[in-house]
Amino acid sequence: MNLATIKVTLPELIGRYQSQADFISIRLEQSEGTQISLRSDQVETLSEGIAMGGQVRVCHQGGWGFASFNRWEQLRQRLEEAIAAARLIGDDETLLAPIDPVQQTFINPLTGKDPRQISLADKKALCDHYNDLLRGTSDKITTTHVRYSDSQQTVLLATSEGTLLEQCWWDLEMRFAATAKDGNGVQVGRETTGSRRGYGDLENLDQVVQGAAQRAVKALTLPTVQGKTYPVVIDPILTGLFVHEAFGHLSEADMLYENPDFLEVMSLGRRFGPPELQIFDGAAPPGHRGSYGFDDEGVPASTTQLIKDGELVGRLHSRETAGKLGEKPTGNARCLNYHYPPIVRMTNTWIGRGETPVANLLDGIEEGIYAQNWLGGMTNGEMFTFSAGEAWMIRHGQLAEPVKDVTLSGNVFKTLANIEAIADDFYWDESGGCGKGGQNGLAVGCGGPSLRIRDVVVGGDAA
């Protein structure tokens, strides 16, 4: 039995059980793809496969039941189990923001090379080529890692409200890392690239790959930045990381709707940044890794403005969070795959382009930091710490010597308020894989212009 055969049976199946619950949703998926992982001279993963499965979500009197399965014949049993669970725990009112049911097929087509037309041997040869570039950069490179993945996903969604959706899309990603060692010093360089357009976006990346290894080797001999508070200029890639990790997660309404104190902090109308600051999230802009037609609750993709002219004006919702807060759903309920229920997730998150010429961002900075790209980061509520991939000192308004081990830390609200200039450049970074609630690696897009921020705490050697 295939998805097309099952699709026509879903409305009737839901109809048989509709009287037993307030809301029923069935989501079925089939995916096929390739996974390759090389570590130094070892092949860790080399596989092609097809996966299929489904999930049932049921809400009754505010209680949710969830069940997943990987054999189609288990669907009815899992539906009954989810209904029983929801009826067991439900003791309140079911509040789901209303939406119009849709019957539609949405296909996000490839615009470049189809990965299915590329043999597994050729995909591995591409990984071998990039791995050789990393390893051949310097004899100081001790470990390399190349990872390739492509997948085509087809999803069916049927609900007790009459929605019957079919969506199909591709996602491709490559990750590169090189570790350099010299005596007791160890440095790492990383790059990631992703696409929903085609296999060609993963080809001809020699300069990008070599750059990761070269940064690791170069950093071995660089001085460590002196840790203190600086004015900092960050490039668009770091801006994208900052807006996603530090601010975007705080805009997800499932962080707010049962936390009155934090809901007060994130109250609409509160000023967080300068009048030039505009922040958005949305799956509606086409061609990005966080783009789609409908979310996993059947809500149409949209663009939500989160900050307008420096003030908080919106947040990201599922139907439940929107219903409980009396707001409109935004199309941000997503799940990684059928094993997990949809939760509020970002899609494509960006800061709007400003008006300050990039060349003017360093003007007037006597001593500061210019940071670009990223190595990693973490957030804890409103606090964040990010590691820059590369950094230079700014002296007397000019770029000066490169430095290493630059970490940027702070409170997101104070940092937004300390934005001094928003540049007129812009870049979309398609390397993102977001993690939340155990659902790690969800494809997202991040974007933004270069920013100038005052009073950023920069870690390094003690002053």
Swiss-Prot record:
Pfam families: PmbA_TldD_1st, PmbA_TldD_2nd, PmbA_TldD_3rd. SUPFAM superfamilies: Putative modulator of DNA gyrase, PmbA/TldD. One of its GO terms (molecular function) is metallopeptidase activity. Keywords: Hydrolase, Metalloprotease, Protease. One of its GO terms (biological process) is proteolysis. The keyword Protease applies. GO terms for cellular component: cytosol. It comes from the Bacteria. Gene3D superfamilies: PmbA/TldD superfamily. The keyword Protease applies. Its EC number is 3.4.-.-. InterPro entries: Metalloprtase-TldD/E_C (IPR045569), Metalloprtase-TldD/E_cen_dom (IPR045570), Metalloprtase-TldD/E_N (IPR002510), Peptidase_U62_metallo (IPR051463), TldD (IPR025502), TldD/PmbA_N (IPR035068), TldD/PmbA_sf (IPR036059). Belongs to the peptidase U62 family. Probable metalloprotease. This is Metalloprotease slr0863. It comes from Synechocystis sp. (strain ATCC 27184 / PCC 6803 / Kazusa).
